Every structure is written in C-alpha cells, then in structure tokens.
Amino acid sequence: MDDITQNLESVEKNPDIGMGRGVYISTYGCQMNVNDTERMYALLEMQNFVPVTDPKKASLIIINSCSVREKPVHKVYSEVGTYKYMKRKNPELKIGVGGCVGQQEKENLMKTQPMIDFVFGTDQIDSLPQLVAKSFAGERRLVNSRFEHRSPYHIETLVRNPGVATYVNITKGCDNFCTFCVVPYTRGREKSRPVQHILTDIRHLVKRGVKEVTLLGQNVNSYQGDEGIDFADLLAKVAKETDVERIRYTTSHPKDFNQKLVDVMAEHSNKIMEYIHLPFQAGSTKVLERMNRNYTREEYLERIAMIQKGLPNVCFSTDIIVGFPGETEEDFQDTLNMVTEVGFETIFAFSYSPRPFTKAAKFEDQLPEDVKNERLNRLFDVHEAMAFERVKRYEGTTMKVLVENVDRDHGKMQGRSTGNKLVHFLGTADLIGKTVDVKITKAFPAVFRGEMI
C-alpha cells in the first residue's frame, strides 16, 4: 500500500460526528483555496456530513478565506456577521474560519468574533475532523494554526467530483518574500511533494475520467523533488509516465523560468499546453527592486523572448500590481508599455493593498487610493483596447478544444483551447471529455464563439 493511500486511510471516520448534518463552505481567493475546500468537503463527508449549497440549511459553516488583499479579509468579517443572526436562532450551528485569514487573523478573530467556534490554519486542514468533533461535543474557541515543518509535502489530492479538468498540488508555501506578499506568512515556507505521489495522484485521476491536470503551486518553477528532480524534470515525467491528455501549470516566477523548461514544453507539445501565466507585477526595474522580485524589466523581456523562440504559438497571461509605494507616473508608464509590448492575452491586475507582516506595508511613500484607482482603470482601458484587436487574428482559425461542460447561460458546449481560450459552440453533452476541432467565427477577449468541424 503506498503512502498516499495510507495517509487517506489514516483519517478516522466517525459517522456519529456528522450524523447527516449539512455543511456549507464559503471559499475566497486563489485556486489553492478552491483545492483546499475540496479537501475539507472530502474529509467531512467521511464523518457523515452532507454538503449543502444554502448556508441556512447547514449545521456547520466554514469560511475558507484569502488575505492576499484587504478586501477579502473584510469580507470574512462581514460574512461572520451575517451568520451570527443564524446562530442566535440555532445555537447548535457551528462556525469555523480557515484559510489565510484563519492563519493570519486568528487572535483578532477570537477576540472580536464571539460567534466563531474554531479557527484553523492553512497547514491544519487535516485536523478539521477533530476540531469539528470537539466543537459538536461542546468545546468552543478552538484554534489550530501550527505550521507543519516536515519536508517533503505529503498531502494527496482529494477531489470529490474532478470532472474533465482538475488541479494537482505539487508545492506549498513560498520562500521568495516579495515585499508586498503575505503568502510566506500564511502558507509557510516552501515544500515540494514527492514525485511518485504526484504521478500516482494523476494516474488515479485519469482513471476517474480526468483529461487535463494543472500542476499547482505558489511558484511551481522552484519545485525540488526527490533525487534532484526539478520542475522541468517533473513536467517531463508527467508527460511520459501518465496517460493524462493535457498538462498545464501555474504559477511561475520569472526569475526561475529557464531554457530547460522551454525545451521540455516543446518536446512534449502534444501534451503540455502552450499557455504560460508569468506575473511581471510592475514594468519598472526600480519598482521591481523594491518588490524584491529579483529580476529587472529587461530580464523579464529576455525570458519572454526565450519562451517565444522555443514556443512560437505560446499565449501569456500575467499579474500586475498598480500603485505600489513610490510608483511614479513614469514607473506606471513602464507598466503600460510592458503590457502592450508583450501583448498579454489576459491580465489580472489589482491596486496595491498593504498587508500585515510585509515589508512594503511599512514603506512611507504609500500612494493615495484615488491615484491607485485611476491608474488601475487606465491599465484596464489600455489592455482592453489591445485585447480586442489581438483576438481578431484568431477569427477563421481552427482550435483543438477540450469540451468541459455545458454553458448554463447559453446552452452551448464550452471548453478550453490549448492556449487556454474559453470557446463556446453548438454541440451535444456526449462531447464532454472529448477534444474536438472548432473553427472560430467570433473572438472576444473573454470568450470565443465557433463551429465544430
């Protein structure tokens, strides 16, 4: 029996805890949080809890939270406030907070939110059944936020209904300590999963009908597996040693992106998708230095050129922070120029939000909110205009689309191209899980429309 199965079977199953009660989990933040929520549901189902979509029907409510920016932190406190009225009507209702806010704000949550029964950190998801059992036994104000310092990272993928495409964690935490980022403090130091655990997960998922996996981590490129295996080696192993049809990965750090990885992607282009999410965060070298990103503007562009040379059809997306402390109008123009020079298909942009524990939160040259918001709107305007022009080149082309599901709003089939474009077309549900050729008839930045051929 392998370690993965042993780890899962070590979870004590006690149906008397759940007793068929409803559990509702509210999820904010990144794909890592979405994966964590799946794990929570799977663990609680083992205790005879039943997932519900309406919190009013739940006996257990968990908020799986994000603290990368200030707004989702405020949403947690607001959401707890809405549930306290439900708890007054039903004293048996249990409320827990996990995720990055649970890790970061545990003391303040316990101090200011008396309706919360328990708080757990990002490394303590597997302690959830025990916390819940104690809570339903009458214990209150429980906290478990200890970081697990064992290495490597031994948690298997738990997905209840994986569908056609799903995610597989390969790393956890981050050692980069960008001055704006709270992740090292909420997710801990970087750990990598053993290679064979990852491969076993993917093989199990393929048996359940999964066609595409995305290898997931805060910085997948810094993966350090057993026997000196790096991320490029891992990617090659997934391509050669599993039957999964499509492979993606996210997120990459520009400082760690190398020629070896490009070569592996080119060698296995039949499986590894031609899409890379490569955050540049700011277009100014001065700002990048203050962010502790460990690359310059020129070095980022050199990596883009290296990737495009080896993968001519590659599509890029990126993350951008606008209004970082000390950012001048000239610095911001460098960011706008970077967007148009690279021609990103998609951008995920936010105004800078000071986070606890981070170095940048202590910088004295913070920008006013109105300046940050104005620059963010300008960035969106520039990218939108560029994106509308760029996508026209796809009209009339044929794309290989992995059909994932039915678009609920329009009744059409939808899936993803190799370049991660969302494509809608007329078809039937029996196409789900198949890769079909679709001719693009109309292209918009957010979605393409086409006809199956």
UniProtKB/Swiss-Prot annotation:
It is found in: Cytoplasm. Keywords: 4Fe-4S, Cytoplasm, Iron, Iron-sulfur, Metal-binding, S-adenosyl-L-methionine, Transferase, tRNA processing. CDD domains: Radical_SAM (cd01335). It comes from the Bacteria. It is an enzyme of class 2 (transferase). Catalyzes the methylthiolation of N6-(dimethylallyl)adenosine (i(6)A), leading to the formation of 2-methylthio-N6-(dimethylallyl)adenosine (ms(2)i(6)A) at position 37 in tRNAs that read codons beginning with uridine. HAMAP family: tRNA_metthiotr_MiaB. Monomer. This is tRNA-2-methylthio-N(6)-dimethylallyladenosine synthase.
